[in-house]
């Protein structure tokens, strides 16, 4: 998700992703929650009011997370393990809890049927018994149409942690190797089929897809008493407007949308299907469409479409995000040196926190601009910009034949 520093703290309807996860866990009746984090986010996690444990080596993945909580477990404890990056409705938690209560399986794993290839773990099944796990088998090599969703109920977690230690490996699938070894040794590992909502949050466009889901939960307009709405402003549809927000003359908010605390939507501005974080300013004549803006973002005569802007981002007048290729093909983004398709023909830019972008900057579809960067005016951004960069340049015309004419 770079340049967004921690996707667990992306906000949807004013709450971080991890807060939404905790709410769903509680609604399903789970009481004791342990959050496993790294040195980079322990402080933020501790503010959530639950026990926080540090995983020293994040490269150990879920295996490391399980080992990190070992000293907090007692012999009769059961553990529900989930990934904060996989969002599921509360029904998923209730389903696995209910199934586990009458199952003699040592491990229960949520499983979801997919209709197209997903680059994750696939399970081989015999009835409800899982007979194997294949990580990223490649399209056409899937052992079934069921994928492993990281919502796992461990009935004997201390025994499984012992298995993890026996299977020590430098591979990033250490946890899955331990499950495979458990299956090989005769443990009953049960698949729990799930048909409800699920959204992995791996790439930036996944966050926008999840935002759309949260917007679908807004049933009616919710406007705080202290919000100031000009008589000539237009509010349409399912919109949440928080305390202290100001919607000025001739501004339009088209839902579903979320306007955070103390936000200013200035004259003639348009916000549609977007989240605007607290204390942000959508300045005069700006348009924000299908985007997620962090806290304290400042716009002035800008177009931001299908984009994610981190906290404390500022756009100078005339800076715009391009979100649609002229050839109408799916937008691609560079991720760790590889071009990854967004699977959509509308996707704009991702800008890291505390970045300032000058006047008349054009961000091409799929652009990434790192955190704490300065982009001077008038440039075209068509490549990945690392964190803490200063970007200045001139544009040069390159003319060649249009082979798609």
Question: PLM features: what roles do these ranges have?
Answer:
Residues 31-33, 78, 106, 188:
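Residues at the starts of beta-strands that form the adenosine-phosphate
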Residues 283-405:
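Glycine-rich hexapeptide-repeat left-handed beta-helix
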Residues 230-287, 291:
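Acidic, glycine-rich loop-and-beta core segments that form the ion-binding/anion-interacting portion
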Residues 214-232:
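Long, charged amphipathic helices and adjacent flexible linkers at domain junctions
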Residues 32-38, 108-111, 234:
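Short, hydrophobic beta-strand segments that form beta-sheet elements in well-ordered domains
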Residues 101, 127-215:
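Catalytic-core segments of class I nucleotidyltransferases/pyrophosphorylases
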Residues 1-44, 50, 54-57:
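N-terminal glycine-rich phosphate-binding loop and ensuing alpha1 helix
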Residues 42-127:
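Conserved beta-loop-beta/alpha segment of the NTase-like Rossmann-fold superfamily
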């Amino acid at each position: 998700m770079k340049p967004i520093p921690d996707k667990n703290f992306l906000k949807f309807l004013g709450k971080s992703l991890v807060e939404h996860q905790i709410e769903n866990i509680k609604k399903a009746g789970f009481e004791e929650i342990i959050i496993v984090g790294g040195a980079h986010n322990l402080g933020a996690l501790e503010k959530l009011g639950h026990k926080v444990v540090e995983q020293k080596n994040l490269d150990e993945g879920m295996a490391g997370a399980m080992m990190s909580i070992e000293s907090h477990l007692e012999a009769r404890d059961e553990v529900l393990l989930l990934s904060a990056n996989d969002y599921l409705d509360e029904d998923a938690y209730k389903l696995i809890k209910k199934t586990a209560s009458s199952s003699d399986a040592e491990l229960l794993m949520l499983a979801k049927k997919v209709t197209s290839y997903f680059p994750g773990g696939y399970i081989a099944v015999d009835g409800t018994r899982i007979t194997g796990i294949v990580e990223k088998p490649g399209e056409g090599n899937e052992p079934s149409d069921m994928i492993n969703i990281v919502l796992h109920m461990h009935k004997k977690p201390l025994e499984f942690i012992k298995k993890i230690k026996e299977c020590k490996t430098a591979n990033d699938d250490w946890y899955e190797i331990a499950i495979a070894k458990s299956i090989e040794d005769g443990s009953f590992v049960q698949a729990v089929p799930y048909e409800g909502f699920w959204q992995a949050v791996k790439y930036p466009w996944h966050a926008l897809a999840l935002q759309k889901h949260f917007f679908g939960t807004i049933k009616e307009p919710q406007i705080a008493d202290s919000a100031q709405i000009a008589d000539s402003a237009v509010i349409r549809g399912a919109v949440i407007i928080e305390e202290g927000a100001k919607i000025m003359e001739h501004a339009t908010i088209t839902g579903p949308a979320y306007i955070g605390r103390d936000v200013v939507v200035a004259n003639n501005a348009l916000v549609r299907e977007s989240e605007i974080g607290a204390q942000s300013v959508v300045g005069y004549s700006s348009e924000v469409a299908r985007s997620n803006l962090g806290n304290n973002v400042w716009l002035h005569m800008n177009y931001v479409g299908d984009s994610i802007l981190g906290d404390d981002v500022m756009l100078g007048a005339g800076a715009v995000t391009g979100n649609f290729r002229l050839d109408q093909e799916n937008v691609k983004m560079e991720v760790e040196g590889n071009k990854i398709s967004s699977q959509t023909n509308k996707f704009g830019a991702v800008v890291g926190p505390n970045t300032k972008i000058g006047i008349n900057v054009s961000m091409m579809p799929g652009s990434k601009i790192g955190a704490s960067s300065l982009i001077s005016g008038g440039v075209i951004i068509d490549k990945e910009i690392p964190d803490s960069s200063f970007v200045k340049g001139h544009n040069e015309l390159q003319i060649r034949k249009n082979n798609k004419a």
